[in-house]
């Protein structure tokens, strides 16, 4: 799941 998919956007930002 990548940010491009729009599903892990929040997770990526939280990381």
Swiss-Prot record:
Subcellular location: Plastid, Chloroplast thylakoid lumen
The species this protein was found in: Chattonella marina var. antiqua (Red tide flagellate)
Induction record: Expression shows a diurnal pattern of oscillation across the 24-hour light-dark, with increased levels during the light period (at protein level).
Assembly with partners or alone: Monomer.
Protein name from the UniProt record: Cytochrome c6
Major subcellular location class: plastid
Gene Ontology BP annotations: photosynthesis
Job description of the protein: Functions as an electron carrier between membrane-bound cytochrome b6-f and photosystem I in oxygenic photosynthesis.
Keyword tags: Chloroplast, Electron transport, Photosynthesis, Plastid, Thylakoid, Transport
GO CC term (a single one): chloroplast thylakoid lumen
Protein family: Belongs to the cytochrome c family. PetJ subfamily.
């Amino acid at each position: 799941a990548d940010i491009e998919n729009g599903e892990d956007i929040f997770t990526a930002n939280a990381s």
